[in-house]
Design a protein with these regions (language model features):
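Non-catalytic cap/lid and distal C-terminal segments of serine-dependent acyl enzymes
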Residues: 1-118
Length: 118
């Protein structure tokens, strides 16, 4: 989820659809207190407020998570940032699922089936 989201948000002109499944979007917790521009510009929760590329508002964004996902709070925060920016997205919260392959195997085909081609 993180890498898909970070790439899509940094390069929205190349991405039409973003499916993030169980993503964490703030890398600061992995940096042991270190912070510089590289950390900032690789933490979507930080840099999204400053972006104004119109393609962000054209992207189809899905944040897939579950109520037992270790990244559940991160997805709620990302949804809030996107909502604050009026960027349309779908926060898909599955019930009673963990941060693991079985739920992602459910999510991915469902998300693919929702893509509208032409």
């Amino acid at each position: 989820g993180y890498h898909a989201a970070n790439f899509a948000f940094r390069h929205p002109g190349y991405v039409s659809h973003l499916f993030s499944m169980g993503g964490a979007f703030d890398i600061k917790s992995f940096m042991d207190g270190f912070h510089n521009d590289d950390v900032f510009y690789n933490s979507p929760l930080d840099y999204l407020y400053g972006l104004d590329d119109y393609e962000l508002w054209n992207m189809d964004i899905v944040l897939g998570t579950s109520n037992w996902d270790i990244c559940f709070d991160a997805n709620l925060k990302m949804s809030k940032v996107l909502s604050d920016r009026n960027i349309h997205h779908w926060l898909d919260i599955r019930q009673d699922k963990k941060h693991d392959w079985p739920v992602w195997k459910e999510m991915f085909p469902h998300y693919l089936s929702r893509i509208k081609f032409f």
